[in-house]
């Protein structure tokens, strides 16, 4: 009886480990780039400004009014949309304008 109980526990343990190993998906791939599966859609990284104040700043500031928010859209061969407050626009507007000019200007051909 005791041997049967031990065998049942071992079988249960093996099944649980097999299911666990099947569901684990981590580690690095040892496949060459040509052997890796193609077509996996990766999510683009989330880019945003990180304040030193962190999350507490979100709760301390008053709610934004519609007139405080400015949305800017650039249409070229691609579309860029940026939404920011008037305060952030005043602070970073010139830098954004410079970045957009650098992106949209024709680059000279390399010889």
From Swiss-Prot:
Biased composition (Polar residues): 28-37
GO biological process: G protein-coupled receptor signaling pathway; gastric acid secretion; negative regulation of inflammatory response; positive regulation of growth hormone secretion; regulation of response to food
Signal peptide: 1-26
Matches recorded under InterPro entries: Motilin_assoc (IPR006737), Preproghrelin (IPR005441)
A GO cellular component entry from the record: extracellular space
Lipid group attachment sites (O-hexanoyl serine): 29
Domain of life: Eukaryota
Lipid-substituted positions (O-octanoyl serine): 29
Modification Valine amide occurs at: 47
Modification note: O-octanoylated by GOAT/MBOAT4. O-octanoylation or O-decanoylation is essential for activity. The O-decanoylated form ghrelin-21-C10 differs in the length of the carbon backbone of the carboxylic acid forming an ester bond with Ser-29. 44% of eel ghrelin is O-decanoylated.
Function: Ligand for growth hormone secretagogue receptor type 1 (GHSR). Induces the release of growth hormone from the pituitary. Has an appetite-stimulating effect, induces adiposity and stimulates gastric acid secretion. Involved in growth regulation.
Protein name, UniProt field: Ghrelin
The organism of origin for this protein: Anguilla japonica
């Amino acid at each position: 009886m005791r041997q049967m109980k031990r065998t049942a526990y071992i079988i249960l343990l093996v099944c649980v480990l097999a299911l666990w190993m099947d569901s684990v998906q981590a580690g690095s791939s040892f496949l060459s780039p040509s052997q890796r599966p193609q077509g996996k859609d990766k999510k683009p990284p989330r880019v945003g400004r990180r304040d030193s104040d962190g999350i507490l700043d979100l709760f301390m500031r008053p709610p934004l009014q519609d007139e405080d928010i400015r949305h800017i859209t650039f249409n070229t061969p691609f579309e860029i949309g940026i939404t920011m407050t008037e305060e952030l626009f005043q602070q970073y507007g010139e830098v954004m304008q410079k970045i957009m000019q650098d992106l949209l200007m024709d680059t000279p051909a390399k010889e």
